[in-house]
Amino acid sequence: MTINDLLKRIDDYAAVIRAYRPLSEAEVKELDAYYRIGMTYSSNALEGNSLTLSETKVLLEDGITVGGKPIRDCYETTGHARAYDHMLTIARSDSLSISENVIRRLHYLFYNGIDPEAAGEYRKGQVFITGTAYVPPAAEEVPECMITFVTELAEKRGKLHPVELAAYAHRRLVDIHPFQDGNGRTARLLMNLILINQGYCIVSIPPVLRYDYIVALQQAQREKAPSDEAFVKLIAECEIEAQKDYCRMFRIELPKP
C-alpha cells in the first residue's frame, strides 16, 4: 500500500472511533493505564531494557521490582511512565505548542532518575549511533538544530497529515540526538504527543519490529538519496494496528478495507 492509501485507511478508522467517543471517565482511566504499561514496555524494549511486559506491569502498578534485573532498567521504566503521564496531560490541551521546553521536559521526566545532571539538558559531547554510518550533529550545533526543528515543526503543522507530522517529529529528533541518552524514547513520546493531540491512537512500536524500525530510520539518514517513505509507512501501519486494538477493546466494528 502507498502512504496515501495507509493515511486514508487511518482516517476512515479514525472517523469510526470519533463517532464512538467521548468515553466515560472510567474508560479513559482504564485506557490510559493500558497504554502506560504497553508503551513503556515497548519503547524501553526497543532500547534493550530487559523487563518483560508482565514485569513492567508489576513495577508500575504495584511498585515491586524484579530480582536480578538491573536497577537502571527499573529506573527507565518508572521514568518513562512519568514522562508518559505528562505527555498525556499536555496532549489533551487545545492550545498545544511544541517548544524546546516541551521536549526537554519529556526527557527530564524520563531521565531524572538515571542521571539528574543530564536530564533535560542538551549533550556536551559527540554521540554515535551504533549500526549506522550516520553521525549526529556536533554538540555545539545542537541548540541551533533544535531551534530550527521546532520552527519547522510549527510550519509543517496543517500542511502534513498528523501521522506524517508525528513521524517527521520522531525521525528528526532522532537525527539531532540532542541528549546524551534517551533520544529514541523521547522521540516516541513526542510522536505520540502529536498523535493524541490530533485525535489519533497511541502508537507503540513492538520489539518484534525493531529491525524494520532501525532500517527505516537508516534509510532516512543515509547520505545518498535519503528517503523517509519506509519510516512513515511503518508509523502509519503501527497507527492502523493501534486503531484495530482500540476497536477490539470497545467492540467497535471497523469498515472492511
Q: What annotation goes with each model-predicted range?
A:
Residues 1-257:
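FIC/Doc superfamily catalytic core
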